[in-house]
Structure formats: structure tokens, C-alpha cells
Amino acid sequence: MAAGTTTKERLERLINAKKQLEAQINRNGQILAANDNVGMSGPLVDAEGFPRNDIDVYQVRLARQTIICLQNDHKELMNQIQTLLNQYHSEIATTDPELVNRASALDLDSDRSPGGANITDLAPARAIVVVNLVSPDSPAERAGLCAGDAILRFGSINSGNFKGDLAQIGELVRNMQSQNVQLKVKRGEQQLDLILVPKTWSGRGLLGCNIVLPPEAMDH
């Protein structure tokens, strides 16, 4: 470690680098969303085997390739953050609340796909929340959410780290106000990658939708 550089400073630099990576992933995710929400695995050919004419196939392929490369960089960065975070906690008795809050939003399980605003083919195991109401002209409606959608991943929150408390999602929404939050949504037999931008609008809250725990979670 360079003289005068603390673990906290190194950790903050890595967290900032993580944000920059996620911003690049988001930009490419927007390309996929703009192309009929094709995501990382949607078909690029029509029923007759010809390239789809309702999307920019070249643009989609390039965005997917870029996202895969960025995800690999993201995974390595998350491993570095995990190591430094453990070191930081071991060095001090009282943690810095602001830094811990920022770090707590990270999906630091290295056995899972990287957290944050990601698009991934590895679908989470189960729904964490279900949408039962979407208000007209709300951020949720503009993102493409519909009543009945099961959300499998909400930003960095997935079935592996969700604690069954809606306040966990509320905290993420507040922290990500006016920023892109990537969602993995199951709608019937379809899985969609959507981009939600929490922000103030003419209605209540930052989303304009109501989410509840899925029935199986409430049975536990």
C-alpha cells in the first residue's frame, strides 16, 4: 500500500470505479431495452430464420458483447472490493456509516454473477417481489413494468441476498434516485431485462407502483 493511502481511500476508489463500470453496462443495457427489450438472450432472427427487422441486430450484438466484457471486469472488481471491505472492517472498531451504507448495496457474493445494474443470462432462482399495481405515466410504467410482473432481480438485490423486507428495496430506490436500476422480470413464461429510473413524478413515491412479497415468501 502506498504511504498515506488508507484502506478506506482505496475502497472508495474501487467503489467509484464500480459505479463507472455499471454506468457503461447501463448505457449498453439501454441499447438492448430500446431494441424491443431483447435483453441478453432474446432471439435475433424471426420465425423464418431471417434477421429481425424490428431491431438493430448489429447494435444488439455489439451491446451484448460489450456487456459480457464489462461483467468480467465487474466480477474482478467486486472480488477486490470484498477483500478490501473485509480488511477495512478488521482495521477499525467503529465503521464509517456512510461508507458501509454504500458498500452494503453491493452484491459481494463472489459465487454469484456481479451485482449492481447488470444484465445476465443467469436468472435468479425465484421472485423476490411481485408488482400488483402500476400507476399511469409513472417511472414504473415508463420502464415497462406491468401489474403481475414477478421481479427476480432489483438492481443489486436478488433471491440470494434479499432478506424478505421491502424496506431493503426502499433503501436501494432512495439511494438510486435519478439513476438507472436494472430489473430482471418474469412475465408469464418470458424473462425481460428492464431499466427503471426512480424519480419524483406527479404521483406518490419514486416509482409509481406497488410491490408485495410473493405468496410463497409470505407462507414462510
Swiss-Prot record:
Belongs to the proteasome subunit p27 family. Keywords: Chaperone, Coiled coil. InterPro entries: Nas2_N (IPR040815), PDZ (IPR001478), PDZ_6 (IPR041489), PDZ_sf (IPR036034), PSMD9 (IPR035269). The keyword Chaperone applies. The keyword Coiled coil applies. Residues 102-200 form the PDZ domain. Disulfide bonds: none annotated. GO terms for biological process: proteasome regulatory particle assembly. One of its GO terms (cellular component) is nucleus. Residues 4-32, 61-91 form a coiled coil. It comes from Drosophila melanogaster (Fruit fly). This is 26S proteasome non-ATPase regulatory subunit 9. It holds the Pfam family Nas2_N. SUPFAM superfamilies: PDZ domain-like. Changing P114A: Does not affect interaction with PI31. It comes from the Eukaryota. Interacts with PI31; this interaction is increased by PI31 ADP-ribosylation. Interacts with Rpt5. Acts as a chaperone during the assembly of the 26S proteasome, specifically of the base subcomplex of the PA700/19S regulatory complex (RC).
